[in-house]
A protein has these predicted regions:
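Short acidic low-complexity segments
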Residues: 67, 71-88
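NAD(P)-binding Rossmann-fold cofactor-contacting core
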Residues: 25, 34-59, 64
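Cofactor-binding loop segments of dinucleotide-utilizing enzymes, especially the Rossmann-like FAD-
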Residues: 19, 44, 122
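Rossmann-like NAD(P)-binding element
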Residues: 81-104, 112, 116-120, 124-125
């Protein structure tokens, strides 16, 4: 969703709220592995300003050479999430919290910099309160992502069918 919104995530600043949880960790690893971004993690367990290592993976380049890839991110305290939101291009919230991690009131008082950004809510129940979205801020919920995924899967199946038909015609 964020790539569709911006076209590319290269050099974007991305904040993951709930980064120490299961979904948050998966999101962090996937983002770090696929994109050259500045990654930030907010959680109630994290302290601000510390750099941390997401993990080290051994990668093969297909020619027998193996490389170590270490992904770093900056930890921020949960209480600093609105202040840091001013600098972010993408904010992903993936917590098991029963309350909102981003509220309309907190957003209006803490996020003063107007800029184009996308907020992605991966939680059930929702983490991000409706009403934050406006001309600059787009809000995408888990149900929208599911629908988008299903559409993309359908398009891939159609493309595979067309390719299969072309191969059958040519053989």
């Amino acid at each position: 969703a964020a790539e569709m919104y911006f076209g590319s995530l290269e050099n974007r600043k991305i904040l993951v709220i709930g980064a120490t949880g299961k979904i948050g960790q998966i999101m962090m690893k996937n983002i770090a592995a696929d994109h050259h971004v500045q990654l930030y993690a907010a959680s109630r367990q994290l302290k601000s300003g510390e750099k941390a290592v997401l993990g080290t993976d051994t990668l093969s380049d297909g020619h027998g050479t193996r490389h170590q890839q270490t992904e770093e991110y900056v930890q921020i305290a949960y209480a600093d999430r609105y202040r840091l939101a001013n600098e972010m291009d993408v904010i992903i919230s993936a917590t098991a919290s029963p309350h909102y991690t981003l509220t309309k009131e907190g957003w209006q008082s803490g996020v003063i910099q107007k800029r184009r950004r996308i907020l992605i809510d991966m939680a059930v129940p929702m983490d991000i309160e409706a009403g934050i979205e406006d001309e600059e801020n787009s809000l995408c919920h888990l149900d929208e992502l599911t629908s988008l995924s299903e559409k993309n899967q359908h398009l891939r199946f159609e493309a595979a069918d067309r390719a299969r038909e072309m191969l059958e015609r040519d053989t």
